[in-house]
Amino acid sequence: MATPGEGNQPSDDGAPQPLAQLQKLEPRVVRRRLSQARHRATLVGLFNNLRKAVYSQSDITASKWQVLNRTKIHIQEQEESLDKLLKLKASFNLQDGNPNSLEEVKEEYARMYSENDSVFLNSFLQDSPPEWFPSEAVGPDAEEEGEEEGEEEGEEGEEEEEGDEEGEEEEENGEEREVEEYQEEEEEEEEEEKKVDLSHSSSTLLPDLMEFERYLNFYKQTMDLLTMNSIISAHEVTLPIVSAAISHLWQTLSEEKKARLLQVWEQQHSAFADLTEACLELAGVEGSMKDSGVDSQGASCSLESTPEEILFEDAFDVASFLDKSEAQHMSNISAMFATCNSENPEEKFQLYIQIIEFFKSLGCVNTPLNQEPEPPDDDDAMLLKCLETFDDL
């Protein structure tokens, strides 16, 4: 019976040990957290001061990585100015015992802070502590904290029990975890800030992409309409004058007409005949048509695809249409070049006018009849010939 009692005796005596260990660890955890809070407050204050120094009041909400980047640029600019002044000083042979070059200034600055960093920091904090620096870290409290840290080091050196060693390991692991968590928080903040900047840039690019997608859709539907009504032949779809005419049509259309036309084409894209009906319907409701409330995205994007997908689909459709037409009419390539040749400027100009007049007859554009279309860049020779003809008359 004595044996079980003796076996239970050590466990009874060792029961208070975990409680004592917790009591010893509690002040350390509190001091460590207080030190971390002071460190974070110091970093926040430094970033705030840097932000105010390198940014104006309108950009006071800049992110940390932007502040660091701007600070780096600011320091480089200050170094360049200082270097110029020191070179000017050296040109006058001024010997005042101070550095005469930028390298000497850097060396003296590094030597001053490496030798007297603690003295300078204490004097700086006692004389004029900044507003962002915690008041607990200045004066007697800072000294008490240093003494407490020294006592902790002595106690840790004297501890030899296994329980204390385990507590130290847990404490170190806890500190490492807190440092890792702090670093992860900083990385997450930087990633979020970068995502916000990217979203701003993408929001500025989206309208241009949508406008380009709308024009591709209009180009494809217009080309189908012209070929269906025999306004242009199959080998004329690749002529620059045709593209110039379609571009002129797109520029003359108002936003309401663009949205309405693309909406009707999207609803009635099953047959080529519906394209003509779309233009006629647009001409019929032109007088009473108001804002349809359809923006560029709603006018040309389906519910099943994203705007980017629709954009690339239309681009591939136009490219495949042009490639197919070119492959089918390789035998007529000489005739196509003859049409594009500057020897027939009247035919090119007539084709341009024919396309514009066809859409005027459908009521899709309201360009005045006496207004000459904007000539493409490759028709300068034709205009010069026209002017010479008028001079001869």
From Swiss-Prot:
Domain of life: Eukaryota
Keywords per UniProt: Coiled coil, Cytoplasm, Differentiation, DNA replication, Meiosis, Nucleus, Oogenesis, Phosphoprotein, Spermatogenesis, Transcription, Transcription regulation
Gene Ontology CC, one term: cytoplasm
InterPro entries xrefs: bHLH_STRA8, Stra8
Protein name per the record: Stimulated by retinoic acid gene 8 protein
Assembly information from the UniProt record: Interacts with XPO1. Interacts with MEIOSIN.
Source organism of this protein record: Mus musculus
Ranges in coiled-coil conformation: 66-95
Composition bias type Acidic residues, residue spans: 141-192
Motif (Nuclear export signal (NES)): 209-218
Renumbered residue ranges of the record's region Disordered: 1-25, 124-201
Biased composition (Polar residues): 1-11
Post-translational modification comment from the UniProt entry: Phosphorylated in P19 EC cells.
Any Pfam family matching the protein: bHLH_STRA8
Tissue-specific expression: Expressed exclusively in premeiotic germ cells in both sexes. In females, is expressed in the embryonic ovary. In males, is expressed in pubertal and adult testes, in premeiotic spermatogenic cells. Expressed by some type A and B spermatogonia, preleptotene spermatocytes, and early leptotene spermatocytes (at protein level). Expression begins in late undifferentiated spermatogonia and persists during differentiating spermatogonia (at protein level).
Single GO biological process annotation from the record: activation of meiosis
Residue ranges annotated as motif Nuclear localization signal (NLS): 28-33
Induction statement: Up-regulated by retinoic acid in embryonic ovaries and adult testes, and by all-trans and 9-cis retinoic acid in P19 embryonic carcinoma (EC) cells. Transcription is repressed by DMRT1 in undifferentiated spermatogonia.
PANTHER family (alphabetical): STIMULATED BY RETINOIC ACID GENE 8 PROTEIN HOMOLOG (PTHR35254:SF1)
Main location: cytoplasm
